[in-house]
């Protein structure tokens, strides 16, 4: 059999299907786009959903890809099984209403067995089919020539793909027989027939025949357009061609494993032979190597695609992978950060097909190193907190486990492992319940979805043509109405109601890429329509949500007018977003990467990644750089080109969380800024007029959000509002001082207030007033403490003349009412008397608006004979409280 590298296998697959007229789809980001149902891209077909459900027209009915994917539902199995991975590559070929069963089976067989391609011996291949799929079974037997003892008809459990509702169908699977060496009990084909987990028969290809629709009640009807969805695990195929016990000894992971051997304690080595030897200690060592190699690969790709360690969603998964790998390193005697040094091994293996990893190398290494260092600190703090919990409660409550998770970022898996070592229980059900409550709150906050986000049947049927003209115009005469619908039905006409309409040509920008939707009006003789929102449809149509006054029908001509004021302000802010992004990359470094943005007529905000603290002077420098570029009067340039040219020829920044078409739009402002962007922008940077950063906040885990304004009018309004707001806050603070000034004046406060009066409205004065407010607040706190101490001292003075009544043993007793004193003042008074008299029992009571209090004190010298807590318990007023032999306190 051929010996093929992973790169050769991938290339051969893609070349084969290109010869069969399949369009090659470049691999996309691990972060799903416009699919809230998925946390990660988890299969090859996940990226093709819009093509299969009709929302978008595919570039070809025949498609092929090699798509990276992540599945994290059972991370704990990684390293334990032979073929389980966090991230994997799925080879696929797909037909959308084109070929079906016979062609799909023929293609698979040709690629696997032809001497030109994989050249796998026919006798090594076994097939399974759904037992009711006679067509597929007979084709395998009669046309392909599979022997009866090499094909098995299995049940719905193994050979029918169905998620409960929607398209579904039977599937056929192809297995490779690795031979008796991998079948210790010599069970043979029964392993397949009875679906027994094994390492002899390796599934290399799954072909799903999507031919039915499940109505949700298990009623099945034939689909009018049948599809093919296939998947073949690249790592599994590599293991077959390289004849390795598991996927981890292939050329994908082996360089990383060998590098781990160089880093770890010399006593630890990876053993290939242990697959057969099964020595428990070596199995544990091998597992650690596998986990590290797997997790560092998945983490590297995720970070390159814009996911950073955090405490929720994808960020938590990446944090968990890094921390789990770091813990496995400790099992191999590695006690410091080391994962970042393995990134280069991952890149060397994967760079041919994923060249962008090289560009992201510094970002990946820095992010992982920072997270490693954080976790080493977290381990120490979290471990201390966990120990206290175990000592105090003899268990870990769900509430405490959540506290460790949220406050310390301490993984629940780590809490469980440590608790098990200490033989104590973790109330995991309570933890899961509390965690689910937190998630539910987050989900509820996101439930305000637009009608078209429901992707209902009406929406997916939209296939009319619509052209966007709004890059160069804000109005369009005689546009034709080509589609009218509501949430519930498709219409041919409408009168006086809220509906959605599509025009053959429209200047209205649909919300996308961080830019808010245009609003405005549609007008003709019969109707005036207020456009209150614009969103993008399944094939790039711009869908207008309108409040209709009058009547419209399909085919009507109508004039479209965008709200120019809103559009102009939005354009300034969108161009400002591009400039501040470039400025931050200049000031902070090219590891800065935009991870989200939003701009409308009110301002702009941009989220970006940066793994360090940001100094005020760095923000000032970025703001100044943007202002410089505005004043340089740089013309906007726009180019339509291929993605390759956009990056190589025009230096455009592309964000891997976005999906791009074959032809992309590049927006450039000289050599300073070049980005892929479909939004509207100013013609020249001078049109932005002005620029100001109004805020910076950390979103956690290396993600920041910067908020900015453009245009002189918006900035002047902001400065006026902020200036007056800050002055009001300063005046409020000063009023607190004035109310107590007669007790004791404070020159420092008066000087600070005088300083604020000298300021006039400007960008600089806003920052200065903020500093003045901070200084004033701090000075006022010190002043208030002084006044409180002074008033307390005066209040206590009237109660300092009590004299004890002394018994024959020389022990004095003071029993007095000190009404108006709080418990703190009473304790201070008791301490003063105890210091004044060596042998004293003192009992003070106080009636206040907050309640009635009692404090009992006993001097240290007589505590062998008298106890404050015992005296407290025997008081006739029956107080409730506690204490010790020296002091007791409570209420009555």
UniProtKB/Swiss-Prot annotation:
Keyword Aminoacyl-tRNA synthetase on entry: yes
GO CC terms: cytosol
EC numbers, comma separated: 6.1.1.7
UniProt keyword terms in alphabetical order: Aminoacyl-tRNA synthetase, ATP-binding, Cytoplasm, Ligase, Metal-binding, Nucleotide-binding, Protein biosynthesis, RNA-binding, tRNA-binding, Zinc
Reactions accelerated catalytically: tRNA(Ala) + L-alanine + ATP = L-alanyl-tRNA(Ala) + AMP + diphosphate
Cysteines paired by S-S bonds: none
UniProt-annotated location(s): Cytoplasm
Broad EC category: ligase
Source organism, top-level taxon: Bacteria
Pfam families given in the database record: tRNA-synt_2c (PF01411), tRNA_SAD (PF07973)
UniProt record, GO biological process: alanyl-tRNA aminoacylation
Sequence positions that bind Zn(2+): 574, 578, 677, 681
Cofactor note: Binds 1 zinc ion per subunit.
Coiled-coil spans in chain: none
UniProt keyword Transferase present: no
The protein's required cofactors: Zn(2+)
Cited HAMAP family: Ala_tRNA_synth_B
Similarity annotation: Belongs to the class-II aminoacyl-tRNA synthetase family.
Protein name listed in UniProt: Alanine--tRNA ligase
Native species: Mesoplasma florum (strain ATCC 33453 / NBRC 100688 / NCTC 11704 / L1)
């Amino acid at each position: 059999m051929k010996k093929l590298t992973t790169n050769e296998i991938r290339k051969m697959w893609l070349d084969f299907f290109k010869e069969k007229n399949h369009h090659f789809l470049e691999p996309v980001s691990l972060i799903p786009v416009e699919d809230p149902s998925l946390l990660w891209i988890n299969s090859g077909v996940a990226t093709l959903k819009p093509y299969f459900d009709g929302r978008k027209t595919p570039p070809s009915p025949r498609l092929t890809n090699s798509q990276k994917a992540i599945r994290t539902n059972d991370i704990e199995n990684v390293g334990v099984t032979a073929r389980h991975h966090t991230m994997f590559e799925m080879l696929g070929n797909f037909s959308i209403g084109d070929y079906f069963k016979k062609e799909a089976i023929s293609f698979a067989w040709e690629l696997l067995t032809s001497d030109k391609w994989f050249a796998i011996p026919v006798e090594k291949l076994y097939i399974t089919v759904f037992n009711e799929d006679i067509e597929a079974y007979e084709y395998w037997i009669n046309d392909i020539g599979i022997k009866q003892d090499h094909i098995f008809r299995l049940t719905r459990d193994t050979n029918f793909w169905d998620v409960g509702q929607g398209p579904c169908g039977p599937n056929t699977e192809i297995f490779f027989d690795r031979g008796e060496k991998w079948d210790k009990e010599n069970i043979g084909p029964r392993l397949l027939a009875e679906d027994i987990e094994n390492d002899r028969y390796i599934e290399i290809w799954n072909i799903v025949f999507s031919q039915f629709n499940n109505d949700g009640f298990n009623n099945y009807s034939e689909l009018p357009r049948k599809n093919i969805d296939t998947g073949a695990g690249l790592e599994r195929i590599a293991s077959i061609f390289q004849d390795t016990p598991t996927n981890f000894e292939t050329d994908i992971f082996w360089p990383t494993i060998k590098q781990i051997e160089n880093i770890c304690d010399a006593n630890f080595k990876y053993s290939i032979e242990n697959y057969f030897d099964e020595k428990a200690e070596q199995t544990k060592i091998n597992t650690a190597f596998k986990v590290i190699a797997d997790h560092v690969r998945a983490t590297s790709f995720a970070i390159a695609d814009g996911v950073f360690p955090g405490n929720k969603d994808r960020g938590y998964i990446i944090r968990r992978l890094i921390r789990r790998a770091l813990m496995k390193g400790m099992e191999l005697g590695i006690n410091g950060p080391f994962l970042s040094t393995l990134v280069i091994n991952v890149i060397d293996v994967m760079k041919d097909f994923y060249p962008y990893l090289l560009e992201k190398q510094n970002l990946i290494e820095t992010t992982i190193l920072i997270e490693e260092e954080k976790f080493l600190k977290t381990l120490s703090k979290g471990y201390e907190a966990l120990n206290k919990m175990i000592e105090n409660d003899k268990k870990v409550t769900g509430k405490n486990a959540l506290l460790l998770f949220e406050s310390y970022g301490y993984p629940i898996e780590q809490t469980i492992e440590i608790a098990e070592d200490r033989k104590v229980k973790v109330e995991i059900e309570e933890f899961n319940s509390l965690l689910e409550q937190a998630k539910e709150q987050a989900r509820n906050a996101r439930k305000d979805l637009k009608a078209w986000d429901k992707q209902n049947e009406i929406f997916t049927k939209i296939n009319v043509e619509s052209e966007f003209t709004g890059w160069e115009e804000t109005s369009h005469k005689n546009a034709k109405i080509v589609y009218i619908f509501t949430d519930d039905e498709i219409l041919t006409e409408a009168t006086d109601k809220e509906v959605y309409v599509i025009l053959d040509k429209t200047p209205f920008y649909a919300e996308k890429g961080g830019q808010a939707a245009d609003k405005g009006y549609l007008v003709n003789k019969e109707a005036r329509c207020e456009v209150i929102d614009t969103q993008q449809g399944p094939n790039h149509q711009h869908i207008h949500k309108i409040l209709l006054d009058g009547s419209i029908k399909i085919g009507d001509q109508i004039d479209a007018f965008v709200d120019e004021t809103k559009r102009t302000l939005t354009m300034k802010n969108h161009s400002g977003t591009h400039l501040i992004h470039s400025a931050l990359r200049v000031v902070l470094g090219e590891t800065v990467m935009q991870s989200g943005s939003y701009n409308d007529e009110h301002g702009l905000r941009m989220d970006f990644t940066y793994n360090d603290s940001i100094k005020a002077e760095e923000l000032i420098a970025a703001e100044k750089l943007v202002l410089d570029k505005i004043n340089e009067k740089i013309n906007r340039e726009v180019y339509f080109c291929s993605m390759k040219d956009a990056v190589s020829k025009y230096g455009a920044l592309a964000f891997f969380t976005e999906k791009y078409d074959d032809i992309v739009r590049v927006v450039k402002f000289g050599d300073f800024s070049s980005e892929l962007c479909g939004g509207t922008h100013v013609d020249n940077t001078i049109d932005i007029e002005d620029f100001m950063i109004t805020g910076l906040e950390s979103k956690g885990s290396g993600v920041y959000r910067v908020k900015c304004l453009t245009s002189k009018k918006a900035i002047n309004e902001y400065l006026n509002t902020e200036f007056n707001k800050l002055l009001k806050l300063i005046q409020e603070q000063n009023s607190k001082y004035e109310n107590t000034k007669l007790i004791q004046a404070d020159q420092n406060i008066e000087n600070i207030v005088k300083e604020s009066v000298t300021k006039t409205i400007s960008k600089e004065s806003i920052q200065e007033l903020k500093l003045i407010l901070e200084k004033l607040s701090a000075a006022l706190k010190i002043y208030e403490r002084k006044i409180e101490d002074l008033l307390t001292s005066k209040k206590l003075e009237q109660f300092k003349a009590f004299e004890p009544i002394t018994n024959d043993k020389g022990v004095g007793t003071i029993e007095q009412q000190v009404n108006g004193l709080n418990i703190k003042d009473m304790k201070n008074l008791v301490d003063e008397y105890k210091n004044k008299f060596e042998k004293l029992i003192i009992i003070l009571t106080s009636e206040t608006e907050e309640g009635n209090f009692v404090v009992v004190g006993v001097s240290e010298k007589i505590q062998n004979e008298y106890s404050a807590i015992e005296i407290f318990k025997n008081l006739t007023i029956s107080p409730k409280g506690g204490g010790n032999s020296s002091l007791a306190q409570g209420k009555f």
